[in-house]
Amino acid sequence: MSTGAQTKAAEASQHADGPRLLADVGGTNARFALETGPGEITQIRVYPGAEYPTLTDAIRRYLKDVKIGRVNHAAIAIANPVDGDQVRMTNHNWSFSIEATRRALGFDTLLVVNDFTALAMALPGLTDAQRVQIGAGARRQNSVIGLMGPGTGLGVSGLIPADDRWIALGSEGGHATFAPMDEREDLVLQYARRKYPHVSFERVCAGPGMEIIYRALAARDKKRIAANVVTADIVERAHAGDALALEAVECFCGILGTFAGNLAVTLGALGGIYIGGGVVPKLGELFMRSPFRARFEAKGRFEAYLANIPTYLITAEYPAFLGVSAILAEQLSNRTGGASSAVFERIRQMRDALTPAERRVADLALNHPRSIINDPIVDIARKADVSQPTVIRFCRSLGCQGLSDFKLKLATGLTGTIPMSHSQVHLGDTATDFGAKVLDNTVSAILQLREHLNFEHVEQAIDILNNARRIEFYGLGNSNIVAQDAHYKFFRFGIPTIAYGDLYMQAASAALLGKGDVIVAVSKSGRAPELLRVLDVAMQAGAKVIAITSSNTPLAKRATVALETDHIEMRESQLSMISRILHLVMIDILAVGVAIRRASPNAELAEAMARAKARAGASAGDEAADVLDWLSHGAAPAAKE
């Protein structure tokens, strides 16, 4: 299966990290495929879900059948809502944890999305040969697209254009309450209510819904129907000309048309409504001759509006694979930075020019970069099946000085491209979900700080601190923790330091400061009027103020030097979690900077440090270099005996 790319072109653009597993899991069957390169989908196989106790068992069977080795990345479109780590299928008995499944199968990535979200992402790429228009109407470019499809359930989704990409909507719109449009549908509703307290559109216009319609009409006509009659039998009888089956199909298509019209006006889907799922394609000409389109347009005052919106039947054989492939590709691109990650792009560009042995090292770096970063050269050589000198030659072929230099560049390529976004924690999130969100939010905030921090101001602050006669750290509430941490670090430099978290003590101490003294004020809001008045007193006496705060705050504007740590916090009323981490990081940066200044070979400074340490009872040999090692997250200085 190809999306239009020529075979030779596809062969030239195979996924560097190996084939990707794609899956389309419905209530009845699980379909699997391998994507060897962009748009090149092969080895499509279908497995009845009832034959496998778990989804993991079905995936393992498929991987065994196609004789594939390791798969690094996989994406699953599933006929079920996906909200968090736990998935419990509505129309099947499979229940699983996404993360536990990923670990059990040894995947680096396992993405699970709603099947109609995946199908929606396939719509912009469909060709005329992969869809059939029903009725009139012309789609408007760059407009919202609606998607629906009866299968075991009634799937619903939509696509919203956003610049040069599309955003898929996750929806459970099939569970909207069914509203009959005529007496026959009233009868169907009354029949369905005997079994279901809430009759949704899914109950009457998904696959099993045709059975309800058929039996309701049979009960009206006082006809006996065998208990084992299913939708496939009804469709077969309709194609054979059976009057009751034909009426059931007609009623089914009419209800589907009403639902499609509801979806179109709800979304404003001027880009068209697409119909997927497994039921409608089996109706063939019965659907084309049905009242579907007439009922789609039957919206009274909005009839003309709907008449201009086209409706399409998707005829592509496995369209969900196209969509889930696109979602997985975007996810991986966001994670690795795509072409923006220079080191990975360099490896790909150079690969064909390398020797066969060096290519094996290149493939290891592309497919398992963290192994390269963390492993010693002997393990890297063993995993790539090359000699250790070959590993070094590979690094130098890329313009690196050696393995250490290459590891550093590779690590930067990985860690420097984490998406800078903020994820909201929701009630009901599992530990896996909210733990990952807290960590991701913190990492993203630190990376944003690295990108936007004014390092010229950092240098100025370090110079001020290094030459200070006395340093006082002020922080109120949560910021007092940061002030205490700073005091603990800076007093080791032999500079008189203290931390105050009480406004009265801050005011009393600030009144004693003067020229040569420094206050480091830590505040998320930067607006506390009492703190600002204290700082004004100190600055009027000649003291300098370094502010660690948000930009454009009164504190930032007053300070001698402002180190701005802007970020997204969940709620103003909450305990400031991310700001505390960023403020602690800023203290680390300042402390390391001062330690570097004081570890330099300056005789006068070294003598002053020695005198300070002697007064503190420490050995003069315990130099600032030891403190630097400790501050920069090396080993803490050993205690002197």
From Swiss-Prot:
InterPro entries: ATPase_NBD, Bacterial_glucokinase, Glucokinase, Homeodomain-like_sf, HTH_RpiR, RpiR-like_SIS, SIS_dom, SIS_dom_sf. Residues 1-340 are annotated as: Glucokinase. Its main location: membrane. Residues 377-396 bind DNA. Its EC number is 2.7.1.2. PANTHER family: GLUCOKINASE. This is Bifunctional protein glk. The lineage of its organism: Bacteria, Pseudomonadati, Pseudomonadota, Betaproteobacteria, Burkholderiales.
